[in-house]
């Protein structure tokens, strides 16, 4: 069996990567909350280069509270005082995930990763994002760079 660790392992440094390595993982997805140079490892390093990051998980069914009911595949939006809308999606049962109001975008930057992940959640048409990724551009619209540009954030060579 080949073990791959996703972002929920919260691999933020070389020590946590070494722990994954010692437990038989062949690849890890570096936490979006990590600075790009923080994880040194022999494992295959993956970065999420596009996607609205989960901000919070809650056992309270937010969707039911907002929509006055809950069904399969249901979702809702939370709006903050600035007018930003945060998608809320049901995970399983009545557990909810609140996602960032804008996606993290690194599609036009050199991440130094061995593999890159496009993390789709609420996109109606993922094709523009895929095209932007393949041509090393940032897609249209609002986005964040997260922690990535705080450390490095070099433009990709074309």
Model-derived segments and their meaning:
Residues 1-158:
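Active-site pocket-lining/capping segments in soluble small-molecule metabolic enzymes
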């Amino acid at each position: 069996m080949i073990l791959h660790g996703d972002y929920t392992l919260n691999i933020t440094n070389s020590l946590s990567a070494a722990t994954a390595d010692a437990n038989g993982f062949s690849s890890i997805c570096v936490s979006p909350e990590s600075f790009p140079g923080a994880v040194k490892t022999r494992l295959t390093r993956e970065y999420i280069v596009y996607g609205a990051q989960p901000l919070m998980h809650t056992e309270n069914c937010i969707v039911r509270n907002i929509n006055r009911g809950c069904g399969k595949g249901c979702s809702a939006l939370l709006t903050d005082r600035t007018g930003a809308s945060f998608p809320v999606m049901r995970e399983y049962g009545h557990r909810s995930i609140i996602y960032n109001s804008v996606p993290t975008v690194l599609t036009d930057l050199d991440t130094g990763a061995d593999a890159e992940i496009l993390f789709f959640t609420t996109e109606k048409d993922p094709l523009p994002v895929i095209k932007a990724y393949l041509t090393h551009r940032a897609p249209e619209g609002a986005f964040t760079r997260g922690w990535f540009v705080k450390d490095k954030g070099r433009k990709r060579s074309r």
